[in-house]
A protein has these predicted regions:
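Membrane-interfacial helix-loop segments of redox and metal-homeostasis proteins
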Residues: 2-414
Length: 414
């Protein structure tokens, strides 16, 4: 008697792709959930909530392709300002949320303070160096995190360089901050709450209108954001892509949530020198960090002794990375991308060193100094923006030395 064998059904490429997507999504969400649980059990509920906020920041950055590096280069090279206009919306929402709370120095019964820093050479030079590093490293402080979370391993040398540059800058920090500088200026204190809001909104509108004028003059029309009619169903919330405006709103709201949770705005770059110092200690490098003025400031000396899971900025950065991992998985776009020409790897490492050094002496990066500084009403945030944008102009035009494209896609990424 002949037995008839029924051929086993073969999975179509579409089914295999869906299966892989679901598997990676489960892994990413499982890992994120475990980290949240571990923090709640071993650190505190606040650390758990901060990682969750970081996760949503990573999700928003990834799905909206919301960034600073490519958005600025898009304006510099292509005369397209959609990304920069989205940043102005983000800042406008932020000042409307932040300024009233910072004016009263209280939010939900807890003390809050902004980033009000001096205006001097350290900000001017540091931000300029950072701007060049953005373009060479193909990312900023937050961009490297969400690139790495999405599987783009090109972010790794840039992040390593960021740690090295940040640690290097802590050795020179006393010299830079000892240079002549103007005292910190808070627009809220100088003008009052309502005038401060109106002045900033007028500046944001002016920048947005300038990009529209420049874009129309160059292209005859303005590049539009993704219309809401294309957001077909609830899946788009989880799988993306999002319009830029969604990313702008979510980032502003979550930065405000960070202010409520920690008493100060979101920051990213400040974690990198700490990671570099921890690595140096692990490698038993004799750097005598205890004698560097940077590490003698309140909170920083204890950060060297404590676990990274106790550090607010490190926990939020890890959340951004894990959130981007989950976002890429849900979008079906997660894959390891590491095949790059050697010059690209060199540019990423060099750019990372410039990012770390520049951010540390300039009191922050695109998040802490630009976003957080302007949202705090500090004039140093505007000085940082001008200097970093000038650096990005230089960086954009030296990219070809490393065989990096100067043209950008229609979607902005950090």
């Amino acid at each position: 008697m002949n037995s008839v064998q029924t051929p086993s059904p073969e999975l179509t490429p579409e089914v295999e792709s869906k299966t892989g997507q679901y598997s990676v999504t489960l892994i990413s969400l499982g890992l994120f959930s475990y980290c949240l649980y571990w923090l709640q059990q071993n650190e505190s509920s606040q650390q758990m909530w901060l990682m969750l906020i970081g996760g949503f920041l990573g999700l928003a950055l990834y799905h909206a392709s919301f960034g600073f590096t490519t958005a600025w280069r898009n304006l510099i090279v292509n005369r397209r300002g959609r990304g920069l206009r989205a940043q102005m919306v983000m800042l406008a929402v932020a000042v409307c949320l932040f300024f009233p709370a910072l004016s009263s120095a209280e939010l939900f019964g807890e003390e809050v303070r902004g980033y009000i820093r001096p205006l001097g050479y350290s900000v001017l030079v540091g931000a300029f160096i950072f701007g060049i590093g953005m373009q060479l490293g193909n990312g900023c402080a937050s961009g490297n995190l969400y690139h790495a979370g999405g599987g783009q391993l090109r972010a790794i040398p840039s992040m390593f360089g960021f740690m090295v540059g940040g640690l290097w800058a802590t050795a020179d920090y006393e010299w830079w901050t000892g240079l002549p500088q103007f005292a910190p200026v808070s627009v809220i204190e100088e003008t009052g709450l309502i005038p401060a809001i109106m002045i900033n909104l007028a500046l944001f509108a002016g920048i947005a209108l300038f990009t529209i004028w420049l874009e129309k003059r160059t292209h005859g029309e303005v590049e539009k954001d993704q219309p809401l009619s294309e957001i077909a169903n609830w899946r788009r919330y989880l799988q993306g892509p999002w319009p830029f405006i969604w990313g702008a709103l979510v980032l502003a709201i979550l930065n405000f949530a960070t202010l409520a949770m920690t008493g100060r705005p979101w920051a990213v770059a400040v974690a990198y020198p700490l990671w570099g110092a921890k690595l140096a200690m692990l490698l038993e490098l004799e750097l005598e960090l205890d004698f560097w003025s940077y590490w003698l400031q309140p909170g920083r000396e204890t950060a060297l002794e404590e676990s990274l899971t106790s550090d607010v900025n490190s926990v939020m950065n890890a959340g951004v990375l894990l959130g981007a991992f989950a976002a890429a998985a849900m979008a079906g776009k997660f894959s390891f991308q590491w095949r790059l020409p050697i010059l690209h790897w060199i540019a990423a490492l060099l750019g990372g060193v410039m990012l770390g050094y520049g951010a540390t002496i300039a009191f922050g990066c695109n998040i802490g100094a630009y976003f957080g500084g302007i949202a705090s009403g500090s004039l140093h945030g505007w000085l940082w923006l001008i200097a970093a944008f000038a650096g990005s102009i230089v960086g954009s035009y030296i990219r070809p030395l490393f065989k990096l494209d100067t043209k950008t896609s229609t979607r902005s990424a950090c």
